[in-house]
Every structure is written in C-alpha cells, then in structure tokens.
C-alpha cells in the first residue's frame, strides 16, 4: 500500500512553516494518543502515521529530502532513517559494509567474521503536563523488550550443550555466491545468521539467547522539554544478537494542553478577563503563573486585546539558562444579568459620552474610515 503524503497526514500544505508543522503535530498527537483511545487500532495506526510524518517534516534536512524526492528519499539505499538509522538497528551501512556485501568481507576480515547484530532501538511515547514539561520531572515507565536469557546467559544453548562453529558458513553467518564478476551474499540457511550450531538449544529462549521481558525504568525529563522532543536512553533498547550491544530507547515527549496557558517556544500565553470599569479607570489584578500568582497593574483606558509582558515567567530553555516570558492578553468583559438600576446608570453614562468623540477613539476612527471608503467608492 502506498504511503500517504506526510503533509496530508498532518493536514498541511507543502509550504507550511515550522510552527505550523509543530502545532499540527501537537494537536493530532494529543487527539490520537493511545492513552486517550485505548483499544482502538485505528487510533494506534493514525498515531504512528502522525509520528512518522513529524519525524521527517520536523527535521529541516529530512524535510528538504522529502520535498525533493518524496518517500523514495527514505527507502533502503537513499535518504535518512529516523533516530539515526530507524527503529530496528537498520539504516545505511558504511563504506566497509558496501564493500563487504560486494566482495566478500570487511577490510582484512577474510570474510570469516561472525555476524554481530546490534539490538533494535525502541520507542516509548509519554504524555506529561505543562507544569512537568516546564519544571522537569521523573517518570517511571514499563517497557516490553528483548533481554538476555537468564537461563543460558545469552548463549542460546542448554547447560553443558556443545556450541560449535557452523560448518556451512564457517562462523560468518553469511553465504557468498559468485555469479560471473559479481559476488552476492545471503544469510546462512543452516545457522540462520548466528554463525554457530547448538547441539541442544535452550528451552527458555529456543536458542535465540534472548527472551521477551517487561522492564521498569526511571526516566529523568529535563526542564524545558516540548512536544516532539526525544530523550535517548543508551543501551536500554533490545538486547543484541550473539552478545552484541543493546539498542537504545527513545522516549518521545507529548505535552498535554493546559486549561490556562498556551505555549509557543519559550513563551507562555494566557487571557485575563477584566471588568470594563477596571479597563476604563485602571487598577491592579492578580494573574496566574506556573510559580503562583503575581500582581499586574492595568493602566487607565486599557483596550481589550492589549498585551502585557511579564519577563522571565515563561519556560527556561533546556539548552541555556534563558527563560521566556509570560504574555497576558486582556479581555474586557461586558457586564451581564444587570438589574434595572444598573441599566439606568449605564444609559446615563452612555448619554454623557455620546457627544464626545474623544471618549471613544477607536469607534470614531472606524466611522471615519467607513466614511472615507464610501466617499472614495462614489468617485470611481
């Protein structure tokens, strides 16, 4: 089945900005997160699609390659694999690997080196609150992974059983065949790539040397992380074959939406409602921050939509020590559920202001613009 266009997966056009991509990813990842859609295979598949699309479009180099070549940029033989080679220890071989496949072995190896396969990289998606993302936290997680077999300690053989070098591939785990000027290489059908023959395979792991296990880990999440950030836990992935190194675990961060604050990079935004009398006369109000409340002075004649910046009350960057700002947007509330006396007072206030344009500069400016518009319209 052909892969969907990554821009289409995130609901974006090809020319979308980095912020557009990030916002779309946050929204969709939160909507389709497995924790919110337990048991839904459709949501799980959609979540995987969204993450795959963001891994490419969220990286400038990968996005450029995708824009030029499409999905072909990431197929075997070209392009880049997610997380430095992709989940599964695959990716692209180096110069030596290419020559090994073509001419029968690494430089100076003689083609008899036992195959060493690093363990798979694993991915774990975790959802945290905005407070946890801003201040940092520790999270206990439980993952399922391939671990070294406790019974045979990774050998794949029962205790006392013989483990011999495979006579078919001489321990390399690969079979080479020459066809004219070319040499092809394939996994040894006798030992299935292990390079060894076991007399009595371990009953616990069936000769693989690894078993599926649940593992508990404590993850330290640094302050300042955001949705899409990845934490690499070296060696916490699946165990490798034949004693090879384990892969890595990548913990992918998802920050839940907050009831009060919205985050954009290092800055936090919130809307603060004030009464129309406070807006007209000025005063002092309390505004929330992630560290508690603080006082904010509202000058007289404040209009709705005015922004107030509280420096240093945003998010501290994990790369530096720089803290962003809290930006409060004032929203002037219209009074509701008025009694007759209150309505009369407002009517009297309106009458006292009606003939004086200086009291309503925005309205007068708007009316002047409308008059000019229609005046110019009649000249054409």
Curated annotation (Swiss-Prot):
This is Chaperone protein DnaJ. The keyword Cytoplasm applies. Keywords: Chaperone, Cytoplasm, DNA replication, Metal-binding, Repeat, Stress response, Zinc, Zinc-finger. Participates actively in the response to hyperosmotic and heat shock by preventing the aggregation of stress-denatured proteins and by disaggregating proteins, also in an autonomous, DnaK-independent fashion. Unfolded proteins bind initially to DnaJ; upon interaction with the DnaJ-bound protein, DnaK hydrolyzes its bound ATP, resulting in the formation of a stable complex. GrpE releases ADP from DnaK; ATP binding to DnaK triggers the release of the substrate protein, thus completing the reaction cycle. Its cofactor is Zn(2+). The gene is dnaJ. GO terms for cellular component: cytoplasm. It is found in: Cytoplasm.
């Amino acid at each position: 089945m052909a892969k969907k266009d990554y821009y289409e997966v995130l609901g974006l056009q090809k020319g979308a900005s980095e912020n557009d991509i990030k916002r779309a990813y946050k929204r969709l990842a939160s909507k389709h997160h497995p924790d919110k859609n337990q048991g839904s295979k459709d949501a799980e598949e959609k979540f995987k699609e969204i993450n795959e699309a963001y891994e490419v479009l969220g990286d400038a180099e990968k996005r450029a390659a995708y824009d030029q070549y499409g999905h072909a940029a990431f197929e075997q033989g070209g392009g880049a694999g997610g997380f430095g080679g992709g989940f599964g220890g695959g990716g692209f071989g180096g110069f030596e690997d290419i020559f090994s496949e073509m001419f029968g072995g690494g430089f100076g190896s003689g083609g008899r080196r036992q195959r060493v396969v690093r363990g798979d990289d694993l991915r774990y998606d975790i959802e945290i609150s905005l407070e946890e993302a801003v201040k940092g936290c520790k999270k206990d997680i439980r993952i399922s992974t391939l671990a070294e077999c406790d019974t045979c300690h990774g050998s794949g053989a029962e205790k006392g059983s013989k483990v011999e070098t495979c006579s078919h591939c001489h321990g390399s785990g690969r079979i080479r065949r020459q066809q004219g000027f070319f040499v092809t290489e394939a996994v040894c059908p006798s030992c299935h790539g292990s390079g060894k023959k076991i007399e009595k395979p371990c009953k616990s792991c069936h000769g693989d040397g690894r078993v599926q296990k649940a593992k508990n880990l404590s993850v330290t999440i640094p302050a300042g992380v955001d949705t899409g950030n990845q934490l690499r836990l070296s060696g916490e992935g699946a165990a490798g074959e034949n004693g090879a190194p384990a892969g890595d675990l990548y913990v992918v961060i998802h920050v839940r939406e907050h009831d009060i604050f919205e985050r954009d990079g290092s800055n936090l935004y919130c809307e603060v409602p004030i009464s129309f009398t406070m807006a007209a006369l000025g005063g002092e109000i309390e505004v929330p921050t992630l560290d508690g409340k603080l006082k904010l002075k509202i000058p007289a004649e404040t209009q709705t939509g005015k922004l107030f910046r509280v420096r240093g009350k945003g998010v501290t960057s994990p790369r530096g020590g720089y803290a962003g700002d809290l930006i409060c947007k004032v929203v002037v509330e219209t009074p509701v559920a008025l009694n007759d006396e209150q309505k009369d007072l407002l009517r009297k206030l309106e009458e006292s202001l009606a003939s004086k344009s200086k009291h309503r500069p925005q309205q007068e400016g708007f009316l002047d613009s409308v008059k000019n518009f229609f005046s110019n319209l009649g000249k054409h």
